[in-house]
């Protein structure tokens, strides 16, 4: 996600029936990781978004007017009055004790070098770098908020997330129309560019025959039938897919039973263009046939516009 502070927000209309008024999400994380964009996206989805409300007033806001007409998103960071790990966790526990509320903690993270670039490009001062170098301020904040990351129900890393993909992730976790049931993100990726940090399950496809070394297949991707057929012709493909689906069949309902709203499954190969793409496509189709909610992303292809 490049420059979360200045990227324009898609203008999507809120659902006609907002509903879900018993839901509360506390949005926190690293400064510059996308809290403002997240709150705006949630607002576009029908949530009431309130930023930097003093923590002592959070419970009062929930109870005001005899309850909430819409679900509530509370933005909290180190600029918030009374901010601290203990006060945030105390407010979270207090809200969770309110009868009938579904309360979640969303933590937004991002790699330090990308945060540095965002603050430098936007010429904004990091709130903890007033009297110290920018990177030192970021590292100090990371140490401060690390207990919140460990406690989070949902963690989204925005390092490589385009704004549109970031909003789709938020919609998957918090969209009012998707209340209930487990949704699955399937993503392909290149090992040479690092693991997707949001992945819950990771599978390695590098043992399969590589279409990269077939001249007529090299410029294509795993979306193309010729590449998909080449990958599927590998004798190891069938047993791998069978083992993978047999593993996922009982796992998916167990994740749903634990209250997980979205699961990210990542499939990797060397370049992220052929084998991992073909398997991710196959896996997404299998899940769709089961009637599941599936979103498919090819990280390397999407970033290159392939």
Curated annotation (Swiss-Prot):
Name of the protein this chain belongs to: Nucleotide-binding protein amb4396
Keyword match GTP-binding: yes
Region Disordered: start-end pairs: 1-20
PANTHER family: RNASE ADAPTER PROTEIN RAPZ
Domain of life (superkingdom): Bacteria
Family of the protein in this entry: Belongs to the RapZ-like family.
Function summary: Displays ATPase and GTPase activities.
Keyword entries, A-Z: ATP-binding, GTP-binding, Nucleotide-binding
Compositionally biased spans, kind Polar residues: 1-14
Ligand binding (GTP): 77-80
One MF term in the entry's GO annotations: ATP binding
Residue ranges of the TM segments: none
Annotated ATP binding sites: 29-36
